[in-house]
Amino acid sequence: MPVVISLLRGVNVGGHNPIRMEALRAVYESLGFHDSQTYGQSGNVVFQTKERNLPRLTKQIEDAIERTFGFRPAVIVRTPAELRDVIARNPFAERRGIEPNKLLVVFLVGSPDENARAKVLAIKTDPEELRMEGRELYMYFPEGMARPKLSWMAIEKMLRISATARNWNTVTKLLEMAVNLDSKR
């Protein structure tokens, strides 16, 4: 059975859209998914499913969350191969001194059009850095994320595409979980 990683947008952020991870796992199990595992409190779920159509899978999850919790977060799904590719494409990987807790990956629902992409890449970001690779943005905050000059939410509005961000440590942990779950097959 294929393994899938889902990332929920805007869950348990600033007291908004609260979901207990135990309840979220129960929703996934009710959809017929197997071995649902969560990581952190922001709606990261690694699970197995027979469903191979990712857009249909995404809609099933969004519908079930809306029925159960009364709100509909965007759900972004990636396969382990796609997440492995996200890690491999990290434009900051070869640079010395990059701190993983200051690196954010913004996962986009789809690919932005060229006009939106050009607008985002034209943003002056110094000292922060922004790179766009496929359906992901990589943002590095050398001075930390407490008071960033660069807002991924503002960028999301420019792109006109739903997105959710995860720090580098979370991204690598989710791949580790997916690989471990996949090895149980």
Model-derived features: positions:
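Surface-exposed, charge/polar-rich loops and edge strands
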Residues: 2-42, 46-185
